[in-house]
C-alpha cells in the first residue's frame, strides 16, 4: 500500500513537472519574435527604429514580443549575414531599416514577412518594373521620400542667384541614385546647371565635397545613409568655403546643411510598427499592403548657417534646434 501511494505520488509529480516544462515552452513560443536589421547608425535611422519598437511594444505588450536589434554598420555583407541568421532563427517578422537591409532581407527569405522603413523608393530598391504601390511579395513598409520637386524648388527659393548646383551622393545606394536623377531633371527644367559628384564610401566624401565647393554655387544631398553617417566631413569643407547645402532629410541638415524639407523618421517607424502588428496579429498579407509615405512635411533650417551665409529664410520655415558646442 505504501509503495503504491509512493508510485502514484511520483507519477503525479512527474506529470506536474512535464506540464510545467510544456507550459514554459508554450509561454515562450507565444511571444512574437521580431528581428530588426538597421543598415547603419545615424540619427534618422535610430529614430525610425525607436518608432517601430515603440509601436510594436505598445500594441502587443512588451511581455509578448521579443525584439532583436542588429546594426550592420554600413556594410551590405553584414546586412546579409544578419538577415540569414534571423531566417535560421525562425523569427516571425523582419524589420529592415533602410535599403541595404531590405535588399538583404529579401534575398534571405521569400516567406517570412518583411516590413521596411527609411527606404526612399521601393520600386528601385526591389527592382520592380511595373510599380503599383504594392510589392506583390513578402515585403511592405514605409518610405522616407519627401517630394523631390519641392526639394528642387527649395534650392531656388533659398539660393536665387545660384547658377550651378552640385549633387553629392553615394553611388552604392540605389535610392540615392534615384533621388539624384529626379532632382537633376527638376533643376535642369528650372534652367540650372547640375554637376554630379559621387562617392563609393565615406573615405571619398571629403574629396568630392572639396571638388564640388570649387565648381558649384550650392550643394544638394539626398537622403543618403553613407553621407548621413559622415556629415562632419562635408561641413568642415562646405562651411568655410561659403557653399550652402540643401539636404534631403533633417539629420543631414543638422550635420552640414542650411535647410531641408523634413519628415519625421520616428513617425514612419511608428507606422511601420503598426503595419507589423497588422501582419502578426491580424494576418494581413504584406504583398497586398500599400507602401506608405510620410504625410507631414515641414520646411526646416539651421539658423546659424543661414546667417553665416547671408541667406534670407522665409517665415514658413521652422528653425532646427541647434546643439550647443
Tell where the protein language model's regions lie, with residue ranges.
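Short, solvent-exposed amphipathic alpha-helices that sit
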Residues: 44-60, 147-151, 175-193, 233, ...
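Beta-alpha junction/loop-to-helix N-cap segments that form part of ligand/metal-binding clefts
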Residues: 68-130, 224-239, 243, 248
Amino acid at each position: 500500500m505504501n509503495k503504491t501511494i509512493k508510485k502514484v505520488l511520483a507519477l503525479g509529480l512527474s506529470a506536474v513537472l512535464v506540464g510545467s516544462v510544456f507550459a514554459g515552452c508554450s509561454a515562450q513560443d507565444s511571444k512574437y519574435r521580431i528581428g530588426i536589421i538597421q543598415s547603419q547608425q545615424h540619427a534618422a535611422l535610430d529614430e525610425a527604429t525607436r518608432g517601430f519598437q515603440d509601436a510594436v511594444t505598445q500594441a502587443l505588450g512588451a511581455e509578448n514580443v521579443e525584439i532583436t536589434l542588429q546594426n550592420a554598420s554600413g556594410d551590405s555583407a553584414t546586412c546579409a549575414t544578419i538577415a540569414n541568421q534571423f531566417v535560421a532563427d525562425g523569427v516571425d517578422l523582419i524589420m529592415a531599416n533602410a535599403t541595404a537591409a531590405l535588399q538583404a532581407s529579401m534575398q534571405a527569405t521569400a516567406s517570412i514577412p518583411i516590413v521596411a522603413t527609411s527606404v526612399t523608393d521601393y520600386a528601385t530598391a526591389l527592382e520592380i518594373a511595373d510599380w503599383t504601390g504594392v510589392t506583390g511579395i513578402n515585403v511592405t513598409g514605409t518610405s522616407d521620400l519627401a517630394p523631390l520637386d519641392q526639394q528642387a524648388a527649395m534650392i531656388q527659393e533659398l539660393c536665387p542667384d545660384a547658377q550651378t548646383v552640385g549633387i553629392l551622393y553615394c553611388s552604392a545606394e540605389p535610392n540615392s541614385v534615384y533621388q539624384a536623377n529626379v532632382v537633376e531633371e527638376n533643376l535642369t527644367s528650372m534652367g540650372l546647371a547640375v554637376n554630379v559628384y559621387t562617392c563609393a564610401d565615406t573615405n571619398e566624401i571629403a574629396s568630392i565635397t572639396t571638388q564640388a565647393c570649387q565648381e558649384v554655387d550650392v550643394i544638394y544631398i539626398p537622403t543618403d545613409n553613407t553621407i548621413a553617417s559622415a556629415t562632419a566631413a562635408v561641413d568642415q569643407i562646405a562651411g568655410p568655403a561659403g557653399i550652402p547645402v540643401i539636404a534631403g532629410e533633417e539629420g543631414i541638415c543638422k550635420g552640414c546643411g542650411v535647410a531641408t524639407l523634413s519628415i519625421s523618421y520616428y513617425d514612419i517607424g511608428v507606422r511601420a510598427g503598426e503595419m507589423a502588428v497588422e501582419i502578426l496579429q491580424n494576418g494581413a498579407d504584406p504583398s497586398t499592403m500599400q507602401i506608405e509615405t510620410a504625410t507631414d512635411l515641414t520646411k526646416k533650417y539651421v539658423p546659424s548657417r543661414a546667417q553665416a551665409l547671408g541667406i534670407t529664410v522665409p517665415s514658413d520655415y521652422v528653425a532646427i534646434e541647434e546643439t550647443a558646442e
